[in-house]
């Protein structure tokens, strides 16, 4: 594996959009066939969690863009993310001809997870851990598909923000990082794409409330990753497979987040 590993974070409503998911994995298959570059997918699945909790008659709230996760809800959330979402991603990979292995953040000690904030409940802070298992899986030609469920050192299941999880995994692997979501990148106050975003501008936009909630979490994770990895991190959309192939080949798509 001479080529730099690429970590792609998949988010937003992608998992509930079968047509978009099919197109995305078709693009990833083309990329893998042409580039022969090690690839790791990291996913959340907030929409599945919302649907499940609603069906169970349970409420769900967010604080500063992070889902508040009462400990009594974590079995359901883990089931939705590490179970349903992960296996749906794997199924799509397999149907596209990509051999895949489903993982969570705890497998092989990939990430070290601790409780982030008692006010958020079973929400984890994620730090890079041991990449050996994932490196071995990549060396065997498999695509690791990693859910954002972690486990603390004392055995507590934790819900981790998928942007933060992808950042920690990229750090552990020394990989490049691309974050894909519903939107085309980071948008300014007028809804226009910001092609390049540095730390000073990002902090200014967050202070003004232009970047807030989930997008603020994403930008903070991207800034942290850019700082730790010492390279730009791309925030873009999964909606346009042709643009995605250009992006994966090194083209300018979405927002490049730098220091």
From Swiss-Prot:
InterPro entries: AceGlu_kinase-like_sf, AcgluKinase_fam, ArgB, Asp/Glu/Uridylate_kinase. GO terms for cellular component: cytoplasm. Pfam families: AA_kinase. GO terms for biological process: arginine biosynthetic process via ornithine; L-arginine biosynthetic process. It catalyses: N-acetyl-L-glutamate + ATP = N-acetyl-L-glutamyl 5-phosphate + ADP. It comes from the Bacteria. The record marks 9, 218 as: Transition state stabilizer. Substrate binds at residues 45-46, 67, 159. GO terms for molecular function: acetylglutamate kinase activity; ATP binding. Transmembrane segments: none annotated. The keyword Transferase applies. Its EC number is 2.7.2.8. Keywords: Amino-acid biosynthesis, Arginine biosynthesis, ATP-binding, Cytoplasm, Kinase, Nucleotide-binding, Transferase. Pathway: Amino-acid biosynthesis; L-arginine biosynthesis; N(2)-acetyl-L-ornithine from L-glutamate: step 2/4. It is an enzyme of class 2 (transferase). It is found in: Cytoplasm. Its main location: cytoplasm. Belongs to the acetylglutamate kinase family. ArgB subfamily. Catalyzes the ATP-dependent phosphorylation of N-acetyl-L-glutamate. HAMAP family: ArgB (MF_00082). This is Acetylglutamate kinase. The gene is argB.
